[in-house]
Amino acid sequence: MGKKRIMFFASLLLITIFLSFSYAGITRESPLSIGKTLSSSNGVYELGFFSFNNSQNQYVGIWFKGIIPRVVVWVANREKPVTDSAANLTISSNGSLLLFNENHSVVWSIGETFASNGSRAELTDNGNLVVIDNNSGRTLWESFEHFGDTMLPFSNLMYNLATGEKRVLTSWKSHTDPSPGDFTVQITPQVPSQACTMRGSKTYWRSGPWAKTRFTGIPVMDDTYTSPFSLQQDTNGSGSFTYFERNFKLSYIMITSEGSLKIFQHNGMDWELNFEAPENSCDIYGFCGPFGICVMSVPPKCKCFKGFVPKSIEEWKRGNWTDGCVRHTELHCQGNTNGKTVNGFYHVANIKPPDFYEFASFVDAEGCYQICLHNCSCLAFAYINGIGCLMWNQDLMDAVQFSAGGEILSIRLASSELGGNKRNKIIVASIVSLSLFVILAFAAFCFLRYKVKHTVSAKISKIASKEAWNNDLEPQDVSGLKFFEMNTIQTATDNFSLSNKLGQGGFGSVYKGKLQDGKEIAVKRLSSSSGQGKEEFMNEIVLISKLQHKNLVRILGCCIEGEERLLVYEFLLNKSLDTFLFDSRKRLEIDWPKRFNIIEGIARGLHYLHRDSCLRVIHRDLKVSNILLDEKMNPKISDFGLARMYQGTEYQDNTRRVAGTLGYMAPEYAWTGMFSEKSDIYSFGVILLEIITGEKISRFSYGRQGKTLLAYAWESWCESGGIDLLDKDVADSCHPLEVERCVQIGLLCVQHQPADRPNTMELLSMLTTTSDLTSPKQPTFVVHTRDEESLSQGLITVNEMTQSVILGR
């Protein structure tokens, strides 16, 4: 009896200690005091009081729970520490969050009051401290909108020119003083935007302009870079920069008291520094002054652009380059406007684009050159992949030349700076050319007789392709697109032999080929009976030639000859996802980590189409057979014949010609022809469930009632969280919680109402964090009828081929 009483009191003591040191939330009745902490639901972050070096100054802050040494990512009272042990953080009668000292004076507050009968403060697993209305569940205030020196995944920097609102990082004064320091980090309202570290009102470091998935002034961010960032700007004068992180890793971005912008990631044992800027002298803003280039060498050094000389030779010799350079020969622009060329452009490679650029929309590379040439105030231009045309009308400031990467900058110079006496060069070149012509004329004539038939045929083929494009297919800007000759394609594919056939879809066959230079290609040969006409063919060429992302297939060119229409793509070794997923042997090659990587890659590609691409694209035919895999099993979205371009951030339209693949089509699209971004989200949800189960939606039938894949997924999620949906061949390689989360995300994507489905930003957040998910509702397309001879859906028939359905008005 005595032992039982001792155990009872010991248990009671442990419970009391636990309750006294860890809170589920802060309320008016349950404040947070010194010595107690508030943890996020999964124990990722912790909120509490802390001090530096056993100082009496106490701060309320958020840090990573269980990681030593402590990394504080947010401080509430950064300017006003408390010095007494009776301080506490609590909810006031008007719903505000307040920090009181022992005299019950307010030391810090969120600065807002709410017409709320009750509220509480909670800490999310994203590290966001939120004040929530108890009645409506609405978030009244959040720390993610009030930054300190640190940015966590899924928080965002932003600006709004209309309201004047701006969200920035502000450094600490020192590593033991969290009060505001000298440095801030912000995104600029320029188009395109760039990230800048400011020292007071002066720029200290800048990233270079944003190019869809990368900052052009950071050389490690090349075209193959997998970006954890997203930057959105709209026409109303607002923009936001969001930081993601993959695979549930702990990470953060911070600005130090010395002005160093750093990105850290935890490897399970320690923090790794993944990025730092400025890293050397060339990163310091304007290090070489106007029209100077900082050459990224060891040590860094300054030089002037061609056609420019140091403004002060003496200062330049002393190593003081901030005065920069001045033009050696003045420009005379009048001649360029009346047809006589007196100025030209000198091209410099591997350059970080200078500051003070201006964006010219809807201009191709040639147009960019022509506009700058005929504008006397245009000093330079660059046509940048992912941006388009940038021009400079002011001094070229903060230019850096990298050893690799960077952009090509074209600088306007007087013609005399571009290579000496042009007339003498022309005369010499003419004499040499004439001599060579006389010597080679006879040999060329003989050779021409032999080659003329082949050459004429090839030219006719190439001209036919271009004329068909120009006259028949209503040309659009496809700069950089190559027109292949028909005989080149026939040779590469061995005249479209069956041994080179990779597969066949609704719009024709796909063949493997090899060009004369050894490059492997995939050729899509459109069938005349496929139903893909001029519009779809042009659509696919225009779209893919402009879209560039690691998770989208890349088009190399096309061929148009007579009735033949061919598209030439990069060849991907592992073909399409369905060849692995639905093959009993090959499916063993894609374990759960690879499947999750494929899921995430498709989501990133879709996010690029919907939000990060300047065209804004709805795919309309997303399915497993349109997901191609490279040699590393990275997914690439393909087949843009049915895709639609749109402007703005949200889009909805309807069509009389409903084209897509039944089973992957959203209900509103299949029934009424209405499509939007959420139509693609529905298709993604179906693909996600197929990847989890290894089952094809058009072939799946479960139980005596013949349940569809969606019906079975819903039933499994309701009964077991969805873990029994997983393909048994990959069960040993999975994390059960990750699988259950993916099942729930898949069901959220296939909701009947488009408004209930997530957008791509929310989708990426769901896949890459452990934040709470909303519960899905029962999806549509779950009722099957079954007789002895056939199995058919009660609502709609599923077919593997892309279909077109004409709807009445």
Curated annotation (Swiss-Prot):
Task: Please give the organism.
Answer: Arabidopsis thaliana (Mouse-ear cress)
Query: What family does the database annotate?
Result: Belongs to the protein kinase superfamily. Ser/Thr protein kinase family.
Protein kinase domain location, by residue? 496-781
Looking up InterPro entries in the UniProt record yields: Bulb-type_lectin_dom (IPR001480), Bulb-type_lectin_dom_sf (IPR036426), Kinase-like_dom_sf (IPR011009), Pan_app (IPR003609), Prot_kinase_dom (IPR000719), Protein_kinase_ATP_BS (IPR017441), S-locus_recpt_kinase_C (IPR021820), S_locus_glycoprot_dom (IPR000858)
According to the record, glycans are attached at N53, N88, N94, N103, N117, N134, N236, N320, N375
Q: What is the lineage of its organism?
A: Eukaryota, Viridiplantae, Streptophyta, Embryophyta, Tracheophyta
EGF-like domain location: 278-314
Mode of membrane association? Single-pass type I membrane protein
Name it: G-type lectin S-receptor-like serine/threonine-protein kinase At1g61480
Q: Which residues carry this modification: Phosphothreonine?
A: T655
UniProt cross-references to Pfam families, sorted A to Z: B_lectin (PF01453), DUF3403 (PF11883), PAN_2 (PF08276), PK_Tyr_Ser-Thr (PF07714), S_locus_glycop (PF00954)
**SMART domains (UniProt xref):** B_lectin, PAN_AP, S_TKc
One GO cellular component term of this record is: plasma membrane
**Compartments where located:** Cell membrane
